[in-house]
């Protein structure tokens, strides 16, 4: 009869820390692997799970069609004509800060369709 995974886990759980270290070293030698590589691979998904939830939309440049960009900025921000024009002419400038990813991507798409150069941070 073969040993189950649960039996192995119980046996390892009952071992002292020094015994576990020796077991890991023996497994590294037996299979020609390093536990450090496994730790680095395991750490990768943890970083991916910490996804950013708030984004800033930055107008980098107005582009050739400044009037269309001003209209898009007015529609997205609710600013008046003069304020939107001043914002577009002062590029690079932050249009919106702390917005969701979906809102940031939608705003970026609308401004790029109007001819602006936009960055989402």
From Swiss-Prot:
Effect of residue 85 to A: EF-Tu-binding and EF-Tu-promoted GTP hydrolysis reduced
Family annotation (Gene3D superfamilies): 3.30.1390.10, Single helix bin
Outcome when changing residue 66 to A: EF-Tu-binding and EF-Tu-promoted GTP hydrolysis reduced
Sample GO molecular function, one term: structural constituent of ribosome
Coiled-coil portions: none
Single GO BP term: translation
Modification N-acetylserine occurs at: 2
Keyword Ribosomal protein included in the entry's annotation: yes
Spans annotated as Required for recruitment of EF-Tu and EF-G, and for EF-Tu and EF-G-promoted GTP hydrolysis: 54-121
Post-translational modification N6-methyllysine, affected residues: 82
GO terms under cellular component: cytoplasm; cytosol; cytosolic large ribosomal subunit; large ribosomal subunit
Keyword list, A-Z: Acetylation, Methylation, Ribonucleoprotein, Ribosomal protein
Entry keyword annotation includes Ribonucleoprotein: yes
Top-level taxon of origin: Bacteria
Post-translational modification: Acetylation of Ser-2 converts L12 to L7.
InterPro entries found in the cross-reference section: Ribosomal_bL12, Ribosomal_bL12_C, Ribosomal_bL12_C/ClpS-like, Ribosomal_bL12_oligo, Ribosomal_bL12_oligo_N_sf
Other remarks on this protein: Ribosomal protein L8 appears to be an aggregate of ribosomal proteins L7/L12 and L10.
NCBIfam families, per database record: L12 (TIGR00855)
Subunit structure: Homodimer. Part of the 50S ribosomal subunit; present in 4 copies per ribosome. L7/L12 forms dimers with an elongated shape. Two dimers associate with a copy of L10 to form part of the ribosomal stalk (called L8). The ribosomal stalk helps the ribosome interact with GTP-bound translation factors. Forms a pentameric L10(L12)2(L12)2 complex, where L10 forms an elongated spine to which 2 L12 dimers bind in a sequential fashion.
Task performed by this protein: The binding site for several of the GTPase factors involved in protein synthesis (IF-2, EF-Tu, EF-G and RF3). Is thus essential for accurate translation. Deletion of 1 of the L12 dimers from the ribosome (by deleting the binding site on L10) leads to decreased IF-2 association with the 70S ribosome and decreased stimulation of the GTPase activity of EF-G.
Family: Belongs to the bacterial ribosomal protein bL12 family.
Protein name as annotated: Large ribosomal subunit protein bL12
Organism name: Escherichia coli (strain K12)
Gene that this sequence comes from: rplL
